[in-house]
A protein has these predicted regions:
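Helix-to-loop junction immediately C-terminal to a conserved catalytic motif
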Residues: 53
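A short, flexible loop at the N-terminus of ABC-type nucleotide-binding domains that lies
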Residues: 1-4, 10-24, 36, 72-74
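ABC ATPase NBD coupling module
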Residues: 15, 57, 69-83, 95, ...
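Q-loop/switch helix immediately C-terminal to the Walker
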Residues: 96-109
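Walker B catalytic motif
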Residues: 171-172
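A short, proline-enriched helix->beta-strand linker immediately N-terminal to the Walker B motif
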Residues: 159-165
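Conserved ABC transporter NBD signature motif
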Residues: 61-69, 128
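The feature captures the beta-strand-to-loop junction immediately N-terminal to the Walker
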Residues: 38-40
Length: 174
């Protein structure tokens, strides 16, 4: 399902700020596997997730998802198959948009409420209700007004609106 072969990433190579973040890492996960990446601050956990998601190209190696080489695939194309929660609860949502608009965006509606049907809005409300934190009553509120925990819960819902092939949770509390 996910196969990482000999990837390496060095930031600022050849400078005094050179930092080897990942060196010759290989990993293989099969469908249904659950894995935890554990390490101290600065160990490269987020860098690994960033490489998988296409935030940057690795210096060496390859990344495959469902036997398809995604090493050079653009970030937006990878996002169709990868759901992600970031360490920072401020990432993963659009703070100036409403809860409903964020959910519409995650559902592939482009965030345009005029194209969101009544049935889709009801689906959003039902999914929010499952979180049991009252967000279903605040669908017209901007996401930027939510607490960090509420945003993390919303981001998890958004990341799984269309079930991803791979879900990355970049924080122990995520």
């Amino acid at each position: 399902m996910l196969k990482i072969s000999h990837i390496s990433k060095t930031f600022n190579p050849g400078t005094v700020n050179e930092k080897k973040a990942i060196e010759d890492l290989s990993l293989e996960l099969k469908q249904g596997d659950f894995a935890m990446i554990i390490g101290s601050n600065g160990a490269g956990k987020s860098t690994l997730f960033n490489a998988i998601c296409g935030d940057f190209l690795t210096d060496t190696g390859s990344i495959e998802l469902d036997n398809k080489d995604i090493t050079f695939m653009p970030q937006h194309a990878r996002a169709r198959s990868i759901g992600r929660l970031y360490q920072d609860p401020m990432r993963g949502t659009a703070p100036g948009m409403t809860i409903e608009e964020n959910l519409a965006l995650a559902a592939g509606k482009g965030g345009w409420l005029s194209h969101t049907t009544r049935q889709e809005k009801e689906r959003f409300r039902e999914e929010l209700k499952k979180l049991d934190i009252g967000l279903e009553e605040r669908m017209s509120h901007p996401v930027g007004l939510l607490s960090g925990g509420q945003r993390q819960a919303l981001t998890l819902l958004m990341a799984t609106m269309n079930p991803p092939k791979l879900l990355l949770l970049d924080e122990h509390t995520a």
